[in-house]
């Protein structure tokens, strides 16, 4: 795989790379660069997580070594539970992520508290605090913070630590959903002041909640868990927001775009003959066009999405139900 092929794979379904020139140079200079993403072990693993894990799988196929940070201290700072509770969830996260298709030989799982309590790391937190305003630290947490009103000081420490994770894990590429962008830009601006390189960052889309909310979240109960049973998936999708002829912010269409067409070269929408019969698509764009034109009914999209998604998530259900 040449550099152009690797670049195309890395940027597939990404919202942005900061910067693409840096990414290209990285691919030209390193056969096995290191990419990382961090997750708070809290609540259910859902399609929002899978969207990012799928990108890490792309990165592995493009030659990257992948680090998955199970950010127990971050979850604690963000009021997601006690340290004991979030650490118990870390193994559940690991099993789900591997079952989604990560190559175990190219994946390194790191618990945040394994290195974030070290003296050098702590000193860097203090150094970074000297170069970061309170306003900027708070602003970087806009789409992440658990408490938006009267937040605790811990939510100011959080983005400083996330920026420092990049250098203390020796990462070449920092990956995250678009909600992480402000923290990554903070890292790019401030880390050079501490003598570190400005990190290259890649951002994935934010999938909408099933209720049409701007973000799928376990705390809002508007999600498909990756270990949901088929009948649960079907019931959730039947109730999901899917306005006829509207593509913008439509979670059902996003499921087709980011998950179903990723796994299938052809997607067949099965429906009764009196409503036009079965129709097969070879690209997401064709399906979206027909939906916007009124050729596809929301219920037909939902029913067929449930079948495809249940099959895609089958390995995860099997892994989670097996003894740990």
UniProtKB/Swiss-Prot annotation:
One record GO biological process: tyrosyl-tRNA aminoacylation
Main location: cytoplasm
Compartment(s) where it occurs, according to its Swiss-Prot or TrEMBL record: Cytoplasm
Entry EC no(s): 6.1.1.1
Chain residues that bind ATP: 218
Binding site for L-tyrosine: 36, 158, 162, 165, 180
Role noted for this protein: Catalyzes the attachment of tyrosine to tRNA(Tyr) in a two-step reaction: tyrosine is first activated by ATP to form Tyr-AMP and then transferred to the acceptor end of tRNA(Tyr).
Superkingdom of origin organism: Archaea
Assembly with partners or alone: Homodimer.
Protein name listed in UniProt: Tyrosine--tRNA ligase
A Pfam family it matches: tRNA-synt_1b
Listed InterPro entries: aa-tRNA-synth_Ic, Rossmann-like_a/b/a_fold, Tyr-tRNA-ligase, Tyr-tRNA-ligase_3, Tyr-tRNA-ligase_arc/euk-type, Tyr-tRNA_synthase
Organism: Methanopyrus kandleri (strain AV19 / DSM 6324 / JCM 9639 / NBRC 100938)
Keyword ATP-binding: yes
Annotated GO CC locations: cytoplasm
Catalysed reaction equations from the record: tRNA(Tyr) + L-tyrosine + ATP = L-tyrosyl-tRNA(Tyr) + AMP + diphosphate + H(+)
First-tier enzyme category under EC: ligase
GO molecular function, one term: tyrosine-tRNA ligase activity
UniProt record similarity statement: Belongs to the class-I aminoacyl-tRNA synthetase family. TyrS type 3 subfamily.
CDD domains found in the cross-reference section: TyrRS_core (cd00805)
Record motif 'HIGH' region, residues: 41-49
Motif ('KMSKS' region): 215-219
Transmembrane segments: none
Keywords: Aminoacyl-tRNA synthetase, ATP-binding, Cytoplasm, Ligase, Nucleotide-binding, Protein biosynthesis
HAMAP family per the UniProt record, alphabetical: Tyr_tRNA_synth_type3
